Regions:
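Carbohydrate-active catalytic/glycan-binding domains of CAZyme proteins
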Residues: 1-370
């Protein structure tokens, strides 16, 4: 069962062992008229086949709709109350949660029903920099055997539900050390990374081998990142350049797309004098907003803070904090920059030439959300 770029849902039989298609594809539902009818799920309950899909695209018009049939290949009849979940209406349009969609239905071991879906949190002005997140909402079945989500087809940051068995989830530690000699699964790269450019030292530091591929190239730079999970947060990382040539650099990037990122970096000139700088890339514009000299000695720790309005950039030398400036959050939002996977905080190393032997060592990465 797949979505079609023309905006309808197809069904065919496959061999679950090989994936081979065993029957021709059949159109079974067009949805309710929203664009991008996609993400189909089928469930059998009480003699009905329920077809759950998403429409509207993963934007403000996202919605979840449902149809059913006595036969798996149709005909399917839509729920008169569609959409069963959306915030593109009077009830949901002022919610801090938007873009609800791509849902699934789950029955608990106690017989309760739930919907899991994705959505994103917005800032004032309906901009969002955080990526899509997973939400859970209670479901009941009405007298006509249709599912009703959270009473009114919307979700909230807090919902009153029957208590389920509780299990405390282990969160991300505020300080991430690299002593284990490996990166945990939540670390991500751009494109297909060159594994040889990511190593670990004997004393437990992450070592990034610089290449001439920059963060604005449609390739895979030496870059490894974690997702920003909070509007209000603080991240910091110490950076040590080794064997750096003139203008080789390493640092931390607040990264949305190849064409939209803020870079906080350390580099040195031809006389091996160190500096720290703040640069932004927004569309066709690349500009170094500020760059200042660093003392010859002393550990440099790069610091990025944020709230709903700004990213704040600075650095510490020998534990003393210095401010470098701020940049508006909305320039990295989906609504301005495009994309929809959210901002990441990435450690990177870039050299001027292929002949450079530069690498950068990172002892730890700190992240604290508020």
């Amino acid at each position: 069962m797949v979505s079609n770029p023309d905006g309808y849902i197809n069904l065919c039989e496959i061999d679950p062992m090989t994936g081979k298609q065993l029957s021709s594809s059949k159109r079974i539902w067009n949805g309710t008229g929203g664009r991008y009818a996609e993400g189909p799920h089928i469930y059998k309950k009480d003699g009905w086949y329920y077809l759950l899909i998403s429409e509207g695209g993963t934007e403000l018009g996202h919605k979840v709709t449902i149809a059913r049939s006595r036969y798996i290949d149709g005909p399917y009849q839509g729920n008169p109350a569609n959409p069963i979940l959306t915030h593109a209406n009077e009830s949901g349009q002022s919610s801090p949660i938007q873009g609800t969609g791509h849902a699934d239905l789950v029955e608990g071991t106690d017989g309760s029903w739930w919907m899991v879906c994705l959505a994103y949190r917005v800032m004032p002005g309906m901009h969002h920099t955080l990526g899509r997140e997973t939400y859970l909402a209670p479901v009941r079945w009405d007298k006509d055997a249709w599912p009703v989500v959270n009473g009114n087809g919307t979700i909230s940051l807090k919902m009153d539900v029957p208590t389920l068995p509780q299990q405390k989830m282990k969160g991300r530690p505020e300080r991430i050390d690299f002593k284990e000699g490996r990166l945990s699964p939540e670390w991500i790269h751009l494109q297909n990374p060159e594994a040889k450019n990511y190593t670990f030292t004997k004393d437990g530091k992450l070592r990034l081998i610089a290449t001439p591929v920059t963060l604005s190239d449609w390739k895979s730079p030496t870059f490894v990142a974690l997702r920003q999970e909070h509007f209000d947060m603080e991240a910091s990382v110490p950076v040590v350049l080794q064997k750096a040539g003139a203008n080789d650099e390493a640092g931390i990037s607040v990264f949305m797309e190849f064409h939209s990122h803020y870079d906080l970096f350390v580099r040195q000139d031809k006389d091996r004098k160190r500096s720290v700088g703040l640069r932004y890339k927004l569309g066709e514009i690349t500009h170094c907003a500020k760059e200042v000299s660093l003392p010859a000695d002393g550990e440099v720790e790069l610091v990025v803070k944020s709230d709903i309005n700004y990213y704040y950039f600075g650095y510490k030398v020998n534990g003393i904090y210095y401010d470098l400036g701020k940049m508006n959050t909305r320039y990295l939002s989906t609504e301005t920059a495009g994309g929809f996977t959210g901002v990441v905080l990435g450690l990177y190393a870039v050299s001027v030439s292929k002949e450079s032997k530069m690498y950068a060592d990172f002892e730890y990465f700190k992240y604290k959300g508020k």
